[in-house]
């Protein structure tokens, strides 16, 4: 059985700005096919010390979820900026609201939001649990917010200090 505690990091210096731009570019065909656009607002040279492959998996998962649950013809928004020695990454999509009581549960293994959100995708409900584990192994946090207009996933990671 899959065990989240088996995740081992192989960290190094990582340009998060470049990674996020690259993931957005890689998903261009999927976005175009669904008549979506991706608005990217990323500060230049956001550097962290982290596992590139594992973090790419986190952001790829968040973007694919945003695409799956986005209203047709709308935009997915990716923002990343440094504040107070932390980097905040927001992946947002316009679409159906996640009920307040389900926002924290979506990070549990095998959890799926009921109703029309879950009928659009066929995942096993592991993606966000894995994302949370990877982010926490990087001494970061991940949370979700949802209102009538959009759903936002906010990842906060420690920024790399000068000389690290």
Label every PLM stretch briefly.
Residues 139-140:
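Conserved glycine-rich
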Residues 10-13, 32, 37-46:
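Conserved catalytic submotifs in the C-terminal HATPase_c
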Residues 4-9, 47-50:
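Conserved micro-motifs of the catalytic ATP-binding
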Residues 73-85:
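Short beta-strand/loop element within the Bergerat-fold HATPase_c
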Residues 66-67:
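Short helix-loop "hinge" at the ATP-lid/N-box region of the Bergerat-fold HATPase_c
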Residues 98-112:
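Short conserved segment of the HATPase_c
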Residues 122, 127, 131:
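Short alpha-helical Gxxx[C/S/T] motif in the catalytic ATP-binding
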């Amino acid at each position: 059985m899959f065990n989240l505690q088996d995740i081992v990091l192989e960290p190094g210096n990582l340009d998060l700005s470049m990674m996020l731009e690259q993931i957005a570019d890689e998903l261009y065909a999927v976005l175009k096919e669904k008549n979506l656009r991706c608005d990217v607002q990323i500060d230049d040279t956001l550097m962290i010390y982290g596992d590139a492959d594992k973090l790419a998996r986190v952001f790829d998962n968040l973007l694919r979820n945003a695409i799956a649950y986005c209203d047709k013809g709308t935009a997915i928004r990716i923002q990343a900026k440094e504040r107070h020695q932390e980097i905040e990454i927001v992946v947002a999509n316009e679409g159906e609201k996640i009920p307040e009581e389900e926002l924290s549960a979506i990070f549990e293994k095998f959890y799926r939001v009921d109703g029309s959100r879950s009928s659009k995708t066929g995942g096993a409900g592991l993606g966000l649990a894995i994302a949370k584990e990877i982010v926490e192994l990087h001494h970061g946090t991940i949370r979700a917010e949802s209102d009538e207009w959009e759903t936002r996933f906010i990842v906060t990671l420690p920024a790399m200090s000068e000389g690290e």
